[in-house]
């Protein structure tokens, strides 16, 4: 009788662990593991500089948004972006060296508060990207989304390469 109870408890613990591990969500700690690094910047490009007028909101580049920036920028990143569903946003601006204040390539890493919020927000983001498929790419995994876009279609190959690197990093986590 005791052996049966012990076996049942072990099975129950295993099932609980399996279910909880399959629904683990990402937190801001994943950002540093997947974000673009200075070594990955294409030749002739650099991290962009934040212009003076924007420094009160965007403190530096690359930068993890504070809550004020999330509230002000969510709907500017993609139409209908809902800041209450986003826990973290990391932004990397890459620009041509000839124009250090430009935003030729931008990578946003968004961490949503839960998978339901991620699903609803990704629907909006994917719809937006579908209208800009020659200039934007998204990657989604659980409650995380990576959104890369370029101003000029000639730079699309750069974000394609960056997205492949980010995708590989996500798969290795």
Where do the model's predicted regions map?
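Bacterial N-terminal signal peptides that target proteins for export
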Residues: 1-11
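Bacterial N-terminal signal peptides
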Residues: 9-20
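A generic structural signal for solvent-exposed, polar alpha-helical segments
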Residues: 12, 51-53, 69, 114, ...
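N-terminal "mature-domain start" segment
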Residues: 22-90, 156-173
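A short, solvent-exposed beta-edge/loop patch
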Residues: 27-41, 46-47, 97-112, 116-173
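Mid-chain, structured segments of secreted extracytoplasmic proteins
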Residues: 72-106, 110-114
């Amino acid at each position: 009788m005791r052996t049966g109870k012990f076996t049942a408890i072990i099975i129950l613990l295993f099932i609980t662990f399996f279910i909880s591990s399959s629904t683990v969500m990402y937190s801001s700690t994943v950002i540093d593991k997947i974000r673009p690094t200075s070594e990955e910047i294409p030749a002739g490009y650099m991290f962009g500089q934040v212009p003076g007028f924007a420094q009160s909101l965007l403190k530096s580049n690359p930068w993890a948004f504070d809550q004020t920036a999330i509230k002000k920028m969510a709907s500017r990143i993609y139409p209908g972006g809902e800041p209450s569903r986003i826990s973290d946003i990391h932004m990397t601006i890459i620009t041509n060296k000839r124009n250090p204040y430009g935003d030729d390539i931008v990578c946003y890493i968004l961490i949503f508060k839960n998978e339901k919020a991620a699903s609803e927000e990704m629907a909006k983001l994917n719809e937006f990207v579908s209208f800009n498929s020659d200039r934007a790419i998204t990657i989604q995994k659980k409650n995380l989304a990576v959104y890369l876009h370029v101003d000029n279609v000639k730079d699309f190959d750069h974000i394609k390469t960056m997205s492949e690197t980010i995708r590989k990093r996500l798969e290795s986590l």
